[in-house]
A protein has these predicted regions:
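Active-site beta-strand/loop signature of hydrolases that rely on acidic residues for catalysis
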Residues: 5-9, 22-54, 101, 137, ...
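Membrane-proximal envelope and lipid/glycan-remodeling enzymes
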Residues: 6, 81, 151, 155-164, ...
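Short, flexible loop segments at the rims of nucleotide/cofactor-binding pockets, characterized by
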Residues: 7-12, 126, 166-169
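Active-site environment of divalent metal-dependent phosphoester hydrolases
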Residues: 13-15, 38-41, 83-85, 157-161, ...
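Short, acidic/polar
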Residues: 13-23
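Structured beta-strand-rich core segments of catalytic domains in phosphoester-bond hydrolases
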Residues: 37-147, 251-255
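Metal-dependent phosphoester-hydrolase catalytic domains
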Residues: 106, 177-189, 196-269
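Active-site-proximal segments of metal-dependent phosphoesterases and phosphodiesterases across multiple
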Residues: 154-175, 200-208
Length: 269
């Protein structure tokens, strides 16, 4: 038996039908999801996010829908902010952040969540670059008889692009500290997410201190985006592992397209 991890920026659930179908059918043991919404009390399916002339449809209660679709998983929602979405001119407060789903056959024996940039914003989305967080979990693998630590992050978005900045260096250092709160000596380690950086980022040097190597670039993949994203460069999402992780299969999934990001699928032992 292998352990399957899928990391995906779900784009606010914009491609809702294929997204839901894929996340059920892929049968992952651990889902690490970025850009997930939750709107307590809302009766709408869709609301609109507005920011400086940009409008995006948001699936209002994607987290709750995923919980219902994945009844065999424990579910965690980890917001970075509460801000306004719109139903016409009506403002509705909504939360936005990470979600993690873990099959219940893998007990969670440790975890930490923390901010890698900024802090929780309760009264609006905040100025760019907006707050970002990370979630780290330690699971026990009954079949193998020892734990594994898994972390994911949504890296900050800078309107100037994906190049390195002092904030991105701090983000990587903060991610390492969150991981160190959870991981024990000897644990296999997987770190993934939409990092919003380029392959030459100092992020990978900093994560390399934990023995991590990126599977996207080291295996010759040059695209983690879908046809819904038309800009260059094509890198945003990464999946890193330590040498004691036996990689059975790794795939930046080209089809089906369920977001403007590709899902990163890892089967490991």
């Amino acid at each position: 038996m292998t352990l399957r991890i899928v990391s995906l920026n779900v784009w606010g659930g914009l491609l809702h039908e294929p997204l839901m179908r894929y996340l059920v059918d892929v049968d992952a043991d651990v889902l690490c999801l970025q850009e997930v919404g939750r709107t307590p009390g809302s009766q709408s399916d869709w609301l609109v996010y507005r920011d400086h002339g940009v409008e995006l449809q948001q699936r209002v209660n994607l987290f709750e829908e995923l919980k219902a679709a994945l009844p065999d998983h424990d579910a965690f929602f980890l917001p970075v902010a509460r801000g306004d979405l719109f139903d016409g001119d009506r403002r509705i407060a909504s939360e936005f952040g990470l979600a993690t789903f873990v099959r219940r056959t893998y007990p969670i024996i440790g975890q930490a969540v923390g901010f890698v940039h900024g802090e929780f914003s309760p009264d609006g989305w905040g100025a760019h670059p907006r707050s970002r967080n990370a979630h780290c979990i330690r699971l026990f693998d009954y079949e193998r008889g020892y734990p594994i630590t898994i972390a994911h992050m949504h890296g900050l978005r800078d309107v100037a692009g994906k190049g390195d900045t002092p904030a991105r260096r701090h983000q990587a250092e903060a991610l390492v500290e969150i991981i160190r709160q959870v991981r024990q000596e000897g644990d296999r380690l997987v770190v993934c997410g939409d990092f919003n950086v380029l392959p030459d980022s100092v992020t990978f040097e900093i994560l390399g201190r934990l023995g991590l190597v990126d599977l996207v670039t080291s295996r010759g993949h040059d695209d983690t985006r879908t046809s819904h994203y038309r800009k260059q460069p094509r890198f945003a999402d990464y999946m890193l592992v330590t040498p004691d992780v036996e990689v059975i299969n790794f795939d930046p999934v080209a089809e089906p397209e369920v977001s403007d990001h590709r899902a990163l699928l890892l089967d490991l032992r």
